[in-house]
Amino acid sequence: FGMEISAASFQTLPAVFAIFLGAVVGSLWSVLGKRQPLAPAKIGIGTILWGCGPLFMTLPFMLYGAADKVSPLWIVVFYLLIILGEAFTSPVGYSCASIVAPQAFATQMITVWSMSQSTGAALNTLAVNFYKEGSEVPFFLVIGLITCAAGLIVLIFGKKIAAGMGMLEKTE
C-alpha cells in the first residue's frame, strides 16, 4: 500500500496477544476439565509453538530477497506463534512450581520458575551473536529446530516427568 510502519509500532502486539491468547488458552483448559493434557504436555506443546515462530520466519527470507519489502503480517504471525507458546507454558510453569514445592517454599519455587525464563532470555542474547547478515534462514532454522526438539522431548517424556514431579496424584 506504499505505507511505512515503524518497528516500534509492533511492540504492543505481544502484550495484546498475551491478554487475548491467555484468556483463550485458559478457557480451553476450563472446557477440557479433567480431559486436559498433563502439565508437561502443555509445556511441550507451548515450547513447540515457540519453536514454530523462528521456523515461520525462515519463510519470508526464502521467498523474498533480503532487501525486499514484505508484508508486516509476517512479524504479526511470528509474534502470534511465540505468544501462543507462552500462553501454554508460562501459567502452567507457575502452577507446577506451586504444586510441586513444599508449602513453605512455594514462593521460592515460583521465583525459580521466573529465573528460568530470565535464563532463557539471557541465552537468547547469546544466540543473537551467531546472527550474521545474509544468514537469516540458517539462524532462524537452527533456533526453531532446537526449540521444537526440546518441546518434543518434553512431550515424549511428559508422563515420566509428571510422575517424577508427583503430579499424577495431584491436579492443577
Residue ranges and their predicted role:
Residues M3-G33, G46-P54:
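Transmembrane alpha-helices of Major Facilitator/SLC transporters
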Residues T12, V16, I48, L80, ...:
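Transmembrane alpha-helical cores of Major Facilitator Superfamily
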Residues L38, I45, V70, W74-V77, ...:
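Cytoplasmic loop-to-transmembrane helix junctions
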Residues I45-A67:
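C-terminal ends and interior cores of transmembrane alpha-helices
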Residues A66-F88:
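Hydrophobic core of transmembrane alpha-helices in multi-pass small-molecule transporters
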Residues A87-P102:
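Intracellular juxtamembrane helix-capping segments at the cytosolic ends
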Residues S98-K132:
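A late C-terminal transmembrane helix in Major Facilitator Superfamily
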Residues V137-K159:
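Symmetry-related core transmembrane helices of the 12-TM Major Facilitator Superfamily/SLC fold
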